[in-house]
Design a protein with these regions (language model features):
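Exposed acidic/polar residues on beta-strands and adjacent loops within beta-sheet cores, strongest
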Residues: 57-58, 63-69, 121, 125-131, ...
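N-terminal, charge-rich interaction modules
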Residues: 2-79
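Charged, structured surface patches that assemble and position nucleic-acid processing machinery
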Residues: 133-196
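Short, surface-exposed beta-edge/turn micro-motifs
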Residues: 71-74, 111-114, 150
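Structural motif
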Residues: 77-82, 118-121
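Nucleic-acid nuclease catalytic cores
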Residues: 106-132
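Active-site-adjacent loop/helix micro-motif of nuclease/hydrolase catalytic cores
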Residues: 82-97, 101, 125-129
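Catalytic micro-motifs at enzyme active sites that drive phosphoryl/nucleotidyl and oxygen chemistry
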Residues: 63, 102-106, 138-142
């Protein structure tokens, strides 16, 4: 393949990754605080989104509180050209060791989700298998201060929308939004509606 065609193909693949990332972020912008080119623990991510919710129950007046809870979701996004098993293992390790520092398991903490969405032009079969079998669950003070789960989604743009999105067990919520937006990209530029 001539150099000009290879450069054009690479640019199109990059555009598809960025287009999918933009669509996913647009689907989450109503509820999440989104930052582009986010620097965290010495690494720059193309995007980072966080969601916080607070709930409480009280009797008659707000001072007579029965309970209160906080839940959080921290979503890291990464765009890569090629994803192999070693690179995915590094990303998972980063989430378990460094991204978990985002979690503040205070007295009213109920749960936090650490989410990692990796958009790749191509992912190896081994990487997809590792993504599917990845498990991480951490409880704080025997569960009295809540828990954290790792939600992982790997998007292989070389596959169809139905087969190209692989998630772990905790990441099942991510699959529908990502698959729907990937299907819209595959339909072509005439479709501009963001799928939530």
């Amino acid at each position: 393949m001539p150099l000009v065609m290879r450069k054009a193909a690479k640019r199109m693949a990059e555009d598809k990754r960025v287009d999918l990332l933009d669509r996913i972020l647009a689907a989450h912008q109503s509820f999440y605080d989104i930052r582009r080119d986010c620097l965290f623990e010495g690494r720059t991510f193309p995007a980072f989104a966080e969601y916080h919710t607070y709930g409480e129950k009280y009797v008659l007046v707000k001072r007579a509180k029965l309970w209160e809870v906080n839940t959080h979701d921290f979503m890291f996004f990464e765009c890569v050209d090629e994803l192999d098993e070693a690179r995915l293992a590094e990303e998972i390790s980063f989430m378990k060791e460094k991204a978990i520092r985002k979690v503040n398991a205070g007295p009213n903490h109920m749960s936090s989700a650490l989410s990692l969405v990796i958009i790749a032009n191509h992912a190896t079969e081994e990487a997809l298998k590792l993504a599917k079998k990845t498990r991480f669950h951490k409880e704080y003070r025997f569960g009295f201060r809540g828990w954290t789960d790792l939600r992982l989604a790997v998007v292989d743009l070389s596959l169809s929308a139905s087969k190209g999105v692989v998630v772990n067990n905790a990441g099942k919520q991510l699959k529908e939004v990502i698959s729907n937006n990937l299907a819209l990209i595959e339909q072509g530029p005439q479709t501009r509606k963001v799928q939530e």
